[in-house]
Amino acid sequence: MRIRVALITLALLATGCGDDEGGDAATNEAPDSTSASTTTAAPATTTTALPTTTTEEPPPPSTTVAPQPVLFNERGPWAVGIVTLDLGDRQADVYYPAIPEPDAQTEIFDSLSVFPAELQAFIPAELTGEFDTTAYRDALVANDEQAFPVVAYSHGFGGFRQAATFHTSHIASWGFVVVTTDHIERGIAAQATGTLGGGAENQDVLDVLNAFDALEAHPELGPVSDLDRVAITGHSAGGGTSARAAAEEVIDVYLSIAAGASERVTQKPAAVFIGETDAVVKPERSYGLFDQLDNAVVVNIAAGGHNSFTDSCVGIYELGGLSVLEALIGPEQVARAEDGCVPPAVEPELAYDVLNHYTVQFLIANFIDPAAAGPLVDVSDLITPLVDFRVTGNPFAAS
């Protein structure tokens, strides 16, 4: 039982840490202005010109000013609501632009709640965590007189639908409806109880499609969710879900976070995120996806790791790692859970900023307004260093 408890605790702090398939910033616009110019006539004079020789000065060399990026790492203009949808044997959370009550408080998520009740007593209290979702439970749905594009998020192996609230809520704040569902066949509860597997073939993709159906049927969210503009993203095994779901007609663009290539690569606009030191899904596996894409951007974060893209990474970083578990589960499993979440890894919040910036820019460019998204450029000097930033074709081709 000690081993099982340790494994459960490890999974809690490092959700999505492995898979077997790889699988208020504002747009800066110059204000309109008109500069008035005046011409003053000089008094008329008569002069006798002397012969002169004039040598023309060569024109000054032209200079090109690099385009200034628009940053999306800060929260967008919308407050965010959260609603939970019942999908039968599993649930999905929806983050959406909202109008909260003046005295409303954002929802705090207790990660201990994702475990079966009979196991919760065995989880050490100091290793559990609470996360501010920065979203308001059941807040009034904003009506922007048009529907918002939809984004699906898929969690990793041993994960749960709330594994990356820093990301899902952030995307919604920029005017998107974000839906994230539990994949119970490979989720945290199944890992904790030893019941992994089962479900239909491609069950995780079916989970996403079923969540879209439930979203469309929701009386308040359905009318503001534009299922003609749809993206999917996912971390680790969820990145594999994203790549496979991209083959579905409903999906227009997709994103992959610390994941490898699927057996069949779909040619739609894509973004690929990599942690430089990821030892769980090694970078070459992620490059295996990017190298096959016609229209894509790849972003490789210096000193980033596999779990740099999850809520739990901050807690592990603040603890200084999980060395207290080595005696129970061994250094290899501890290293797997710590991947990207202990120094000298990049601070988790900086990895969050990079992921949030490029994700929102990619979505705005493809679904709303390419001009408002700004140029797609390396933000190493503005957020945190990247070891690789490359574009192939036109990642904004869906616009």
Tell what function each PLM region has.
Residues 13-16:
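C-terminal motif of bacterial Sec signal peptides marking the signal peptidase cleavage site
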Residues 27-64:
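Extracellular mucin-like PTS domains
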Residues 60-151, 336-345:
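Domain-level recognition of soluble alpha/beta enzyme cores
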Residues 67, 77, 88, 312-399:
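Alpha/beta-hydrolase-fold serine-hydrolase catalytic core, especially in secreted/extracellular enzymes
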Residues 128-190, 279-283:
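Short substrate-entry loop that stabilizes the transition state in hydrolases
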Residues 163, 167, 194-227, 232, ...:
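Alpha/beta-hydrolase active-site loop
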Residues 234-238, 242:
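Gly/Ala-rich beta-loop-alpha elbow adjacent to hydrolase catalytic centers
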Residues 272-274, 278:
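Short beta-strand/loop motif that positions the catalytic acidic residue
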